[in-house]
Amino acid sequence: RIAIGRSPSTVAIYLRAIRRMPERPQGALPRDRARTLAPIEVSQPGVRINPVRLALFRDVCGSPDGGLLVPPAYPECLFLGPMAEAVLSDAFPFSPFGLIHVRQRIALLCPIDPGVTLDLSCRLVEIRETDRGFEVDFAMRADAVGTEAWNGTTTLLSRNERARSGHGRSRDGQAPWISGEDPFRSIV
């Protein structure tokens, strides 16, 4: 389990990723790690929402509640630090470069006031092999005043050599729609 006090800067994230790049493959599990995947969990307690960043998010994405509450999709933005720590940890088997965000599911369980302090956690849930490489699911959770207020699952793809070469890519350039997916669910 990894605990962080604050999110690392973008520069620090990139420098750490560059240092680890030679030892980590894309889209393949190293033979010695295939059966010894360690659990990864990162927590970041006491996160305050930056009002300037929240206002920028609202300007770009809009806010259905008139700006009084945190928009349902915003908490994911707070997970840059915990997610970076997870994919840069020694236990994560793939290169952080080339990871592609392929799917997101979020659930707002109760309204989040912009002034509340959040406790964030993310953990590796599953790694599965697909024809395009390995998909990695991370579960994210934001607690406000000791109660779960928001959760989500992010799916990242580490493409294998075949997928990186463009084999199997759609000729018309259209991205396929994922049928039956409900990427957002609000209970409030």
Regions from the PLM with identified roles:
Residues R1-R103, A163-G168, G173-V188:
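Hot-dog-fold acyl-thioester-processing enzymes
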Residues C61, A86, I112, L118-L120, ...:
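Generic alpha-helix signal with a bias toward terminal, lower-confidence helices
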Residues L99, R103-V145:
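Hydrophobic beta-sheet segments that form the core/acyl-binding groove
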